[in-house]
Amino acid sequence: MGHFTFIGLCLLAMFLSLSGAECYTCPIDWLPKNGLCYKVFSNPKSWLDAEMFCRKFKPGCHLASIHRDADSADLAEYVSDYLKDDGNVWIGLNDPQKKRTWVWSDRSSSNYFSWNQGEPNNSKNKEYCVHLWAPTGYLKWNDAPCETLHPFICQCKY
């Protein structure tokens, strides 16, 4: 009886220690970060096609949204390692109403921005989607025409 009591207490202790822990598993070759999983895709797509591609993984998947400097730095490092500064990368920020009101495709709050100097500039009045800008090591953002083909980064909650 003592052996079963010991095992039971061990299982209870393990359960209690994990009950508040975040538990998720990202697919192989996805980056786990703050309860989300991120993956860079190097096959260039328009912003809308990239967003639709991300959504096909499972409900709640979108182009990546970035809300803090620390997350921006981590994703920039991940993208740099993956692409080796080979092209800009779509993220989920866009201006669907074309009124310079930026929103994330996952509808999360948009109170953090990391624009490159002079951006967003809406060059030729046709830049309504946002990419991580390769010349800045993917740390800064640039608005661009949504039809432009770029690699992209998806985020999913698993």
UniProtKB/Swiss-Prot annotation:
GO molecular function: carbohydrate binding; metal ion binding
Primary localization: secreted
Motif Mannose-binding: where in chain: 119-121
tRNA-binding found in the keyword field: no
Glycosylation sites: N121
Signal peptide, first to last residue: 1-21
Disulphide-bonded residues: C26-C37, C54-C154, C61-C156, C129-C146
Regions annotated as coiled coil: none
Expression sites by tissue: Expressed by the venom gland.
Keyword DNA repair: no
Keywords: Calcium, Disulfide bond, Glycoprotein, Lectin, Metal-binding, Secreted, Signal
Gene3D superfamilies linked: Mannose-Binding Protein A, subunit A (3.10.100.10)
A GO CC term attached to the entry: extracellular region
Record localization: Secreted
Residues noted as binding Ca(2+) in the record, renumbered to the chain: E127, N142, D143
Domain spans labelled C-type lectin: 33-155
PANTHER family, sorted: MANNOSE, PHOSPHOLIPASE, LECTIN RECEPTOR RELATED (PTHR22803)
Family: Belongs to the true venom lectin family.
Oligomeric and partner information: Homodimer; non-covalently linked.
Function text: Mannose-binding lectin which recognizes specific carbohydrate structures and agglutinates a variety of animal cells by binding to cell-surface glycoproteins and glycolipids. May be a calcium-dependent lectin.
Protein known as: C-type lectin BfL-2
Lineage of producing organism: Eukaryota, Metazoa, Chordata, Craniata, Vertebrata
